[in-house]
Design a protein with these regions (language model features):
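Residue-level signal for beta-strand positions within conserved beta-sheet cores that form or flank
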Residues: 93, 146, 288
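Anion-binding (especially nucleotide phosphate/pyrophosphate-binding) glycine-rich loop
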Residues: 1-128
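Short, well-ordered alpha-helical segments in soluble proteins
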Residues: 110, 128, 132-136, 151-154, ...
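Short acidic (Asp/Glu) patches
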Residues: 101-104, 134-136, 165-169
């Protein structure tokens, strides 16, 4: 497949990197290589590439905040959406957002244009494509609360539109087909009071800075919150705060964050996560689920 990609890449604007070290890209700064890493130029080229690779495994990365590639690497192609997927515009009563836009940048755009209900995105690391896929949320709002429509491309290179009603959004997940790539989303455009919007963003950022180790090498929330409970509380009450495996440690500031202290491996991160899962299950009979996506 590498030779085939090298051949077709000569006629494309998309950039291809082979045996790409994913630790350069993911926020954990850990993990293995991808056989092929592709910075996609535009939708037409993404269609071409998907048709050319056939059944060759692929995945997609946004900001790299919620992904870990195992040390053995990923024998497939990892796509990252380029600048043609990084556009926002307002059309009638909708905000049209490219999937490559960072969550925080959408919050800033909404603030500038006096659009409410997007403040929560200022507290979420990542890109809009990932936020839609996993129904990201915080501080009382989730993506499903503001989404109207999603545009995807499937593994055959076909464009498909989904309305909100067609997608079964749940806590940190959706039923979007696993073989599809989100390329854009349409959101409700509701105007609000600028000062209130700015105050909400200020409060969210303050809470985040005071409660999370945001300046460390971390992927954010490690585990999903169980129903009617909080992963961080369960982890702390299970005696896991400060627990360490190799160069990765459970944050003393927020127990649902794992921190790469220096040069942690992906296996150390995964091993520590497994220890936490076991400890919480043994104490509370609750099995935590990874919020971080692990591939390879």
């Amino acid at each position: 497949m590498k030779n085939h990609i090298k051949k077709i890449s000569q006629n494309l604007n998309s950039k291809f990197y082979f045996d790409y070290d994913m630790s350069k890209t993911v926020w954990f700064r850990a993990g293995g290589k991808a056989a092929i890493f592709c910075l996609v130029y535009d939708i037409n080229e993404l269609k071409i590439i998907l048709k050319e690779i056939g059944d060759f495994p692929f995945d997609i990365i946004g900001a790299g905040s919620n992904l870990l590639v195992r040390d053995r690497g990923f024998n497939g192609i990892i796509f990252k959406l380029g600048k043609e997927f990084n556009k926002i515009n307002i059309c009638e009563r909708s905000v049209n957002v490219g999937a490559g836009i960072l969550d925080n940048n959408l919050a800033k755009f909404a603030e500038v244009n006096n659009i409410k209900n997007f403040e929560f995105y200022s507290g979420i690391p990542g890109s809009i494509g990932g936020a839609v896929k996993m129904n990201a949320g915080c501080y009382g709002f989730e993506t499903k609360d503001v989404i109207k429509e999603i545009k995807c491309i499937n593994n055959k290179g076909e464009l498909i539109n989904y309305s909100k009603d067609q997608i079964n959004f749940d806590y940190r997940k959706s039923n979007l087909p696993v073989n599809s790539i989100i390329i854009s989303a349409k959101f409700d455009c509701l105007y609000g009071n600028k000062k209130e919007i700015q105050l909400n963003i200020k409060n969210i950022k303050k809470i985040r800075e005071n409660s999370q180790p945001i300046k460390s090498k971390t992927s954010g929330s490690t585990f999903k919150n169980p129903k009617n409970n909080f992963a961080a509380k369960l982890i702390e009450q299970s005696g896991c705060k400060g627990l360490q495996v190799g160069d990765v440690i459970v944050s003393e500031k927020h127990a649902n964050f794992l921190i790469n202290l220096n040069q942690a491996s992906a296996s150390e991160i995964e091993d520590l996560g497994s220890m936490i899962i076991d400890a919480v299950y043994n104490k509370f009979n609750i099995k935590l689920e990874w919020e971080i996506k692990i591939i390879g």
